[in-house]
Regions:
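Anion (oxyanion) recognition and catalysis
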Residues: 67, 86, 126, 164, ...
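Short acidic, glycine/proline-enriched helix-loop-strand junctions
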Residues: 83-95, 168
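Active-site-proximal loop/turn and secondary-structure-junction residues that shape catalytic pockets
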Residues: 51-53, 78-80, 98-100, 139-141, ...
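Histidine-acidic metal/acid-base catalytic patches
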Residues: 2-61, 65-67, 129-131, 186-208, ...
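Catalytic domains of carbohydrate-active enzymes, especially glycoside hydrolases
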Residues: 62-81
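Active-site acidic/histidine proton-transfer and metal-coordination neighborhood
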Residues: 18-26, 104-205, 215
Length: 294
């Protein structure tokens, strides 16, 4: 497949950003391979490395399979992995930002250290043509939701200018506090949306994790349509179990993806499930991506 107009802009942009390194890459054996066709449908589909659980693939093997299956990119990879993603025409769709699930940006004492890490992550993402950096609120640990909201807004207000200047979106992740992450503060869409409203920047949005918000709220499609302007990225997994979203779980992902696509959403939907041990990981990934071709 030739690198032409049929290759989506972000994928072409990622390769163009690193184009000055082409000669060096060829010499060192990391030049881009021929790009596989992306998945059909209106949504760009990405992956988290958890989908390869149960395989013995190294990073290059994972990138090779991701490209073969028509993925747009891979989430939560840092600069050391950018060259191998580039080799297979994959975008680093979400870059780690330096905050943590338990210790995050809702606590002022973390702001100096995490702010420096976040600024570096934004620079790394911009240099690679990566669209997003992840942020995590952190656990409550005695902090009220209102104080935590104020602290989170303060942090993101301090980071929004470098994000805006470098065209990178900082995505605050919504997680469930009921099953997987007891105490996590950013556990409801309304709280996350309020953060985004107060910061008021096109480069501060939410990472809407469908699995987590199904546990906390349900009503996924209506919630997404109401708040799509504040959503910069999606994660998928089946519930219960956080495995593949087949007929062993409760959500209709074809319907959910259609609802997302109907909003005109232009970002990425990345699969973050872990395949059941009785399933072939690569066959499962192919099947899950087919479900989301809407």
């Amino acid at each position: 497949m030739k690198l032409g107009s049929s290759v989506p802009l972000r994928r072409r942009g990622f390769l163009a950003t690193l184009g000055s390194l082409t000669a060096f890459s060829i010499i060192n054996g990391t030049a881009p391979t021929a790009l596989a066709e992306l998945r059909k449908g209106r949504l760009k589909q990405g992956l988290c490395l958890s989908v390869f659980s149960g395989t013995k693939l190294d990073m290059e093997g994972k990138c090779r399979e991701a490209a073969r299956l028509g993925a747009y990119g891979i989430d939560l990879v840092g600069p050391k992995d950018f060259p191998v993603l580039k080799k297979y025409g994959l975008v680093p769709t979400m870059v780690p930002g330096g905050s943590g699930i338990q210790s995050g940006i809702n606590d002022k004492k973390n702001h100096a250290e995490m702010g420096a890490k976040m600024e570096q992550s934004i620079k790394d993402a911009a240099a690679a043509g990566a669209p997003n950096v992840i942020a995590l609120a952190g656990d409550r640990k005695g902090i009220s939701d209102e104080e935590g909201l104020d602290n989170t807004v303060l942090f993101l207000n301090n980071i929004k200018k470098p994000a805006e200047d470098q065209n990178v979106t900082v995505c605050l992740e919504l997680l469930n506090s009921k099953v997987d992450h007891p105490g996590y503060m950013c556990d409801h869409t309304t709280w996350g949306v309020e953060v985004c409203k107060r910061v008021n920047s096109p480069r501060i949005k939410l990472l809407y994790d469908i699995y987590h918000m199904q546990i906390m709220e349900g009503d996924i499609v209506r919630t997404v349509k109401k708040n799509i302007q504040y959503i910069g990225h999606f994660h998928t997994a089946g519930n219960p179990g956080r495995h593949q979203f087949d007929d062993t779980q409760e959500m209709n992902y074809a319907g959910i993806c259609k609802g997302i696509a109907d909003t005109g959403y232009q970002g990425c939907l990345s699969h973050e499930y872990s395949p059941s041990k009785d399933k072939d990981p690569l066959e499962t990934l192919d099947a899950m991506m087919r479900i989301c071709e809407v």
